Design a protein with these regions (language model features):
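Non-catalytic signal-transmission and effector/linker regions of two-component phosphorelay proteins
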Residues: 1-2
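Walker B beta-strand of ABC/ABC-like P-loop ATPase nucleotide-binding domains
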Residues: 5, 52
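Acidic catalytic/metal-coordinating carboxylates
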Residues: 35-38, 59-64
Length: 74
């Protein structure tokens, strides 16, 4: 399962990636991003199966990112 982690707090983002990599060899963290704009690029490039997304982030929050992803057909 391809997983993208989108979280503005670096310790949380890195912790999630670390935990997911240890839980199961079937989990493949395909990338992480620190805001919604970077997250959109990650989604377009990697097309993950699961998105772990923070809702409150600076610049573009998680809800705005989801709306934009839907508008782009991602």
């Amino acid at each position: 399962m391809k997983i993208a982690v989108i979280e503005d707090e670096k310790p949380i983002r890195e912790g999630l990636v670390h935990i997911l990599n240890k839980i199961s060899p079937e989990y493949q963290v395909v990338g992480s991003a620190e805001n919604g704009a970077e997250g959109l690029i990650l989604l377009e490039e990697e097309m993950p199966d699961l998105i772990m997304l923070d809702i409150q982030m600076p610049d573009m929050d998680g809800l705005q990112m989801l709306k934009e992803a839907r508008a782009r057909g991602i």
